[in-house]
Each structure stands twice: as structure tokens, then as C-alpha cells.
Amino acid sequence: RQMCIRDRSEVATMEDYLRWMSNVVIDSQGGHIQPLFGIGLEKSLPESFVDNLPGYRGMGPVRVGNQAQEHFQHDVYGNVILGAAQAFHDHRLLHRAGAREFRALERVGEQAVRVFDQPDAGMWELRTRARIHTSSAIMSWAACDRLAKIAATLKLPDRADYWAGHAEGMRERILKESWNEERQAFAESFGGRDMDASVLLMAEVGIVDPKDPRFISTVDELERVLCDGPYMRRYEAPDDFGRPETAFNICAFWRIDALARIGRKKEARAIFEAMLAVRNPLGLLSEDTHPVTGEMWGNFPQTYSMVGIINGAMRLSARWDSVI
């Protein structure tokens, strides 16, 4: 989301976002950050059931609040630092971050180092299964990689070397332990074989070159097992509710980004146009889409899905200097 704001040059919105993110970091206890807050930084969002409501099409229970506040989702540290890094590099900002903010971010980075190879609920907030998720490990790597770059910008060579060393060690382990030789793909978790669409983020965050044969074969395998036409499911393993039946819309946009990066732009554009066609009359997308009926499911409208539209449009658009 932060990259979407950055790339669209929404500077005022970006400054507000960075200010909110700074408050999260400053308020963190020993570097730990819970995966979600209330808009006013509320930490307690207890989940309860409304027993007298049947739920959508009788598919209860109806929940109030979100238990995910209690989860350990280790990708959060990389996401925080990826978002906050903009404050150190972007000369459009009225108030750029400096050494004080960097020291606060380093606490978050140390937490990323501690949890890098520890099981968690993953970005999908799984309630009954913990693994060392590849996507979480990737974000721990991103935390260290961006801290090294921030330190270089601040002319702190010792800290740059420190964080670059952590990043390189993590990268070696991720590429080794998440690779499944049988499937010729990066798997959902260390030592696993199940596929998960979130590994498509490897190219976007920069841990692998999109032209790396391993990444290209991963895209091929993900398309084989998770895609129904333009739609893409999150993962193939059963979750808390069984095997997923609906496609998760942001995954289709991750696929579009990956295809464009590896040179399959024509296919990426066709998928993008298919996703635009299932929006409602106001141009909005839900969280999920049923791959057979095209019916919208899940939270509506869904920020992730709308960010996917924006990022996809920018990825597929020609540069002005190529058309003028």
C-alpha cells in the first residue's frame, strides 16, 4: 500500500501515513508490533460473536472485532520498515527522517532478526497452523536490506554493514530452505512443498531477480495449481475452513506484476482487463471472487484489491517518454 501511495506521488497522504507509522514504531514494546490496530492506534480489538444474527446467507458466525490482533505475523516488521524507509529517501517530503527515527526503526529490525526463522500465522492470519512462512522470512530480509540502505543514506557505514550482513545471511537461507526441488518452485514455507501466491512478492521486494530461472519456474507452478483463468487462490493447503473455493483478488494482481516483470506483458494485460471487468458499477472490487460465477465474496470494498488495480495499471503503463 505504501508503494502505491509513493508511486502515485500522493505526498500529503504519504506524509500522514508515515506519521501514523512513526507512532506505531515509537509505541512498540521491545520492537514487537501486533499485526493490526484500530485507526486511533487502539491495541485491544477483542473478537466476539453475535449469536442472534445468521450471517451472510446463513454462513455465520457474525464476528465483532478481530482476533488477529493476538496473532504473531512476522511479516509485519518488514512491512513497517518498507513503509517507513520512504521518509529517509524522498526529497519531496517536508520533514525527512534522520538518525533518531533510524534508531527507533532499528528496534523493529532487531525483532525481525529474532523472528526470521520462527513459525507464525503468516500474512493470511491462519488460526490453527503455524509454519516458518516464506513470505514472513522475505519481509524480515526486506527489513534488514532497507535498514542497510537507510544507514548508507545517513552515512552510518558501520550500521550499513551490520544490517547488510543480516540481510545476506537471511537471503541465503530463504533461497535454500524455501526451494522445493521436486516442484521446481519456492514453496509456502521452509522445507515445505505447498504452494502459496505470496511468494510472488519475491521479485517486487527485490530478494530475487525476476529473470532468475527459479522465480520463473515458481510463477509457472503457481499458475498451474492456483489459477482458474484470470483468478488466483491464495494457497493450496487446507486452512481453518477447509480448501479455499474462492479466488483472492490481490493474488491476481501479484500475478500480473510478476508476469510483467518476467516479460509476459501481453498475458498480464489480458488478466488485468479481465479483473477490471468484474468490478461493480462504481469500479470497486471485493476481497474474493468466485472463479466460476464471478460473484464477489469477502470484505467489500477491499483495500488490497483496489491497491492491486492501481499497482497493476502503473506496472503495465508505458513511460511517457516512450509515447510522446
Report each predicted region and the residues it spans.
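Inter-helical turn/loop segments and adjacent helix faces that build the functional surface
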Residues: 8, 87-100, 119-127, 146-164
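C-terminal substrate/ligand-recognition segments
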Residues: 245-265
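Short, small-residue-biased leader/transition segments that mark boundaries at the very start
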Residues: 1-5
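Loop-centered beta-sheet repeat module
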Residues: 129-184
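Membrane helical hairpin/interfacial module
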Residues: 9-41
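Extended glycan-interaction surfaces of carbohydrate-active proteins
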Residues: 31-71, 83, 107-120, 168-249, ...
